[in-house]
């Protein structure tokens, strides 16, 4: 039965759409849709010819399709006269999933550099169904073709070996499991894979190292608060400064140490950058000979974006930690100033209290000393007045009656003054007026005694008072010494 091939078929096309597209040209027996292409089987050959003639290049589900007669036997991968191959090109491995690998492999040598794997696959379809094709991957000017069956591979080896493709005669060699060619090809393939793996591992290591250093960097910066310097300054400056600050660091505080740490880390960061650049250059130079250079560039751009985002987050966290540390330092300074002011006020109060107590003790001792001086001056005046009165009495012995009255009046006045003095002086000076009272009682009780005996009694009382006055002065002198000792203390 005649079959029609449909190329450039839209992925959205269904069997109903294809049936509608070919409706009116004849009876359709079967519609077989593949990825990007399909087959339609007609009942009559003339209907198939009409469909191919009129529908080639028409739109089907938004795509301009290719409609041709199907070449080769139906549902069979055997060789035919060859197809146009355009639809099969579109159904390559880059769009329709991974190809199936088989052991029926041929090595194509002396392949033209203009011949792609798609061209090679289309050319090899003359011999049979091709499952996998590759060109210039392991080695330049060399390709690989894999077939579904061993018979297809043998047919291609017999029929297509020595034919010309793009002006070059190709040479087909069977790739056996024990052959040198397979070994060398697999070696070269594994070598290229290991290269790419080592590249990726180097990159990942350098990235992880740089991320670790950046984490520790953020910690040291949050401690010290000198984080904006190492970023804003150039790398060469940070290197020279790190050398200077290393020599200065033992004499300075923790701040200088953290500053010397941060340039060291910036130096390590710049080294990481330089290593990454060298590795990227190496990988770019190697990727020129291989195909996956786009993947490397994409991964680089992604890693740069991630680094930029991480640096932004770190800067925000550093600013927050700086503000927190500043507020903590301010609160500490405030509490210290408060405690200092409190201690100062307490010490001032203590000093004032001590000064007051000293002033009070001094004033007390002064008042005591002044009182004792006054009392001693009063006593001296009393003694002198009593001695003068006794002299006057001796002179006036001849006139007894007037002298008695005068002496009595004087004694009364002295007694009154003595009582006043005794009241003012207190308990320590109370026994002073006793001899005066005794002398008064003796003088009053013996009015008939002659004047000589009276004068003797008066003189005896004077001697008594004199003898008692030194004892008073002796009793006052220890009180003065006590007051002086108080004032000294």
UniProtKB/Swiss-Prot annotation:
The modification Phosphoserine is found at residues 78, 84, 289, 291, 293, 441, 453, 455. Residues 179-206, 214-246, 333-356, 456-469, 479-489 have a biased composition (Basic residues). Keywords: mRNA processing, mRNA splicing, Nucleus, Phosphoprotein, Repeat, Repressor, RNA-binding. It is found in: Nucleus speckle. GO terms for molecular function: RNA binding. The keyword Transcription does not apply. Pfam families: RRM_1. One of its GO terms (biological process) is hematopoietic progenitor cell differentiation. Plays a role in alternative splice site selection during pre-mRNA splicing. Represses the splicing of MAPT/Tau exon 10. This is Serine/arginine-rich splicing factor 4. It comes from Mus musculus. The gene is Srsf4.
């Amino acid at each position: 039965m005649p079959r029609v091939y449909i190329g450039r078929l839209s992925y959205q096309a269904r069997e109903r759409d294809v049936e509608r597209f070919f409706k009116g040209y004849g009876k359709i027996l079967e519609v077989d849709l593949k990825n990007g292409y399909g087959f339609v089987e007609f009942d009559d050959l003339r209907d198939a010819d009409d469909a191919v003639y009129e529908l080639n290049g028409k739109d089907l589900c938004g795509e301009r399709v290719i409609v041709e007669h199907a070449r080769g036997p139906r549902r069979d991968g055997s060789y035919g006269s060859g197809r146009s191959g355009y639809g099969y090109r579109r159904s390559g491995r880059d769009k329709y999933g991974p190809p199936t690998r088989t052991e029926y492999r041929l090595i194509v040598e002396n392949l033209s550099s203009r011949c792609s794997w798609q061209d090679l696959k289309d050319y090899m379809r003359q011999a049979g169904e091709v499952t996998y094709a590759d060109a210039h991957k392991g080695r330049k000017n060399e390709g690989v073709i894999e077939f579904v069956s061993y018979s297809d591979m043998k047919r291609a080896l017999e029929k297509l070996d020595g034919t010309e493709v793009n002006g070059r005669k190709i040479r087909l060699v069977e790739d056996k499991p024990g052959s040198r060619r397979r070994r060398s090809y697999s070696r070269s393939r594994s070598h290229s894979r290991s290269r790419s793996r080592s590249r990726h591992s180097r990159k990942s290591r350098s990235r992880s190292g740089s991320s670790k250093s950046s984490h520790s960097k953020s910690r040291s910066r949050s401690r010290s608060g000198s984080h904006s310097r190492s970023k804003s300054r150039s790398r060469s400056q940070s290197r020279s400064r790190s050398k200077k600050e290393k020599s200065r660091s033992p004499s300075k505080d923790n701040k200088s140490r953290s500053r010397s740490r941060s340039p060291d880390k910036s130096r390590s960061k710049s080294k990481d950058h330089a290593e990454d650049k060298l590795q990227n250059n190496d990988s770019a130079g190697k990727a020129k000979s291989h195909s996956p250079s786009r993947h490397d560039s994409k991964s680089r751009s992604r890693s740069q974006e991630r680094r930029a985002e991480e640096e932004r987050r770190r800067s925000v966290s550093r600013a927050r930690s700086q503000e927190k540390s500043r507020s903590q330092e301010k609160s500490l300074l405030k509490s210290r100033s408060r405690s200092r002011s409190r201690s100062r006020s307490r010490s001032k109060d203590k000093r004032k209290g001590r000064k007051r107590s000293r002033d009070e003790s001094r004033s007390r001792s002064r008042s005591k000393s002044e009182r004792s001086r006054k009392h001693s001056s009063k006593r001296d005046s009393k003694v002198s007045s009593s001695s003068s009165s006794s002299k006057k009495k001796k002179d006036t012995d001849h006139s007894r009656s007037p002298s008695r009255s005068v002496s009595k009046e004087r004694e009364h006045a002295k007694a009154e003054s003595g009582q006043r003095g005794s009241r003012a002086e207190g308990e320590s000076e109370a026994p002073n007026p006793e001899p005066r009272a005794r002398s008064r009682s003796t003088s009053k009780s013996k009015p008939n005694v002659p004047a000589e005996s009276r004068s003797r009694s008066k003189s005896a009382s004077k001697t008594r008072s004199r003898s008692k006055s030194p004892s008073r002065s002796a009793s006052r002198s220890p009180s003065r010494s006590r007051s002086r000792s108080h004032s000294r203390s």
